[in-house]
């Protein structure tokens, strides 16, 4: 018989830096999950992605065991890293903060493809370009 799913918890945690402090501790503690075990496993699995924020979906079962799936970093984090900026523009339609080439957008779209609902790479690129535009990043050929 399969284990009964108690809940799913969605968090965004810096890669390799999960600690029992908030937001991880309270989110897992209220469901009786072994927080240190999660932190250790998450940090091992994400050590190679240091500096990025990694979304994680934690499935908690009725016997207090858990499994988790890590996803690709948010498009905005990847765009900021590629452009070398700290944050997007406060007024993206008037004030531009960076310029990226289309091939950089393509690499980000390829990386995000498993988590996007886009049917093709071109559609994924348009999605990433829209995120870039809303952050004040100009995309050029």
From Swiss-Prot:
Keyword rRNA-binding in record: yes
Keywords: Methylation, Ribonucleoprotein, Ribosomal protein, RNA-binding, rRNA-binding
Post-translational modification remark: One or more lysine residues are methylated.
Entries under InterPro entries matching the protein: Ribosomal_uL11 (IPR000911), Ribosomal_uL11_bac-typ (IPR006519), Ribosomal_uL11_C (IPR020783), Ribosomal_uL11_C_sf (IPR036769), Ribosomal_uL11_CS (IPR020785), Ribosomal_uL11_N (IPR020784), Ribosomal_uL11_N_sf (IPR036796)
Top-level taxon: Bacteria
TM spans (from-to): none
GO term, biological process aspect, one: translation
A Pfam family that the UniProt record links to this protein: Ribosomal_L11_N
Gene Ontology molecular function: any one: large ribosomal subunit rRNA binding
This protein's GO CC annotations: cytosolic large ribosomal subunit
Assembly description: Part of the ribosomal stalk of the 50S ribosomal subunit. Interacts with L10 and the large rRNA to form the base of the stalk. L10 forms an elongated spine to which L12 dimers bind in a sequential fashion forming a multimeric L10(L12)X complex.
Family, similarity comment: Belongs to the universal ribosomal protein uL11 family.
Function field: Forms part of the ribosomal stalk which helps the ribosome interact with GTP-bound translation factors.
Protein name: Large ribosomal subunit protein uL11
